[in-house]
Design a protein with these regions (language model features):
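Charged, amphipathic alpha-helical segments and their flanking helix caps
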Residues: 1-25, 47-132
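Short acidic low-complexity segments
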Residues: 27-35
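A short, hydrophobic beta-strand-centered structural micro-motif
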Residues: 37-46
Length: 132
């Protein structure tokens, strides 16, 4: 078992998505116009904060980790169902890491359909990633 880091969480969720949806392109970098669809953008929301212990120090204590995932599809007619299907896979991956879903919203554009989900969990100093 390995230590929980933002990269380990990204790798775990991206691998879970691409194992089920082989045509999805996952990235952790924001690209304004993604060259291929369907795509998912997974990133940690930068406003996480460490939680202090009773002695008010921050060593080996808990911290809040929040992630956002954007699933973007442009298939005419099936964009919504495809995006929601990919998001369900992402939810299952985040749930297996004990994240809870904070919100989900969708945006229907003229050319694309986007589903956005946010997830959060408290991570302790001794937590580790599950074996895949």
């Amino acid at each position: 078992m390995s230590e929980i880091t933002r990269n380990a969480i990204y790798d775990y969720v991206a691998s879970a998505i691409t194992a089920v949806h082989t045509n999805v392109r996952c990235t952790s970098r924001y690209i304004p116009v993604l060259p291929s669809y369907p795509s998912c953008y997974i990133h940690e929301i930068e406003h996480y904060r460490p939680l202090e212990n009773m002695q008010l120090d921050y060593e080996d204590v808990q911290w809040q980790s929040s992630f956002e995932i954007q699933v973007i599809s442009n298939k005419k007619g099936t964009a919504a169902s495809e995006a929601y299907s990919i998001m369900e896979t992402a939810k299952a991956a985040f749930n297996s890491l004990y994240f809870r879903e904070l919100s989900e919203t969708s945006i229907e554009g003229t050319e694309t359909f986007t589903v956005i989900g946010r997830f959060r969990r408290t991570i302790g100093g001794g937590d580790s990633m599950p074996k895949s």
